[in-house]
């Protein structure tokens, strides 16, 4: 009976360790998706390279930094 109890305890410990996500766990696709969704400012079609900023209309579309 003690062998069965030890086996049950080991199985419960292993299951509980794998079932609970750790704090540092992230889905593998999240960083890649964030990079895909982000448009670099210099590549934004409304970015003004002479002023090195975006007009206020483009700021609503994610272009940073904003002019004025």
From Swiss-Prot:
Modification Methionine sulfoxide occurs at: 61
Entry keyword Kinase: no
Pfam families: Conotoxin (PF02950)
Tissue-specific expression: Expressed by the venom duct.
Any one Gene Ontology cellular component term annotated for this protein: extracellular region
Propeptide residues according to the Swiss-Prot or TrEMBL record: 20-52
Residues with the Cysteine amide modification: 67
Disulfide bonds: 53-67, 54-63, 59-66
Localization per Swiss-Prot or TrEMBL: Secreted
Keywords: Amidation, Cleavage on pair of basic residues, Disulfide bond, Neurotoxin, Oxidation, Secreted, Signal, Toxin
Keyword Flavoprotein carried by entry: no
Signal sequence residues: 1-19
GO MF, one annotated term: toxin activity
InterPro entries documented for this protein: Conotoxin
Domain notes for this protein: The cysteine framework is III (CC-C-C-CC).
Role: Intracranial injection into mice causes scratching, hyperactivity and circular motion.
Family: Belongs to the conotoxin M superfamily.
Record-given protein name: Conotoxin tx3b
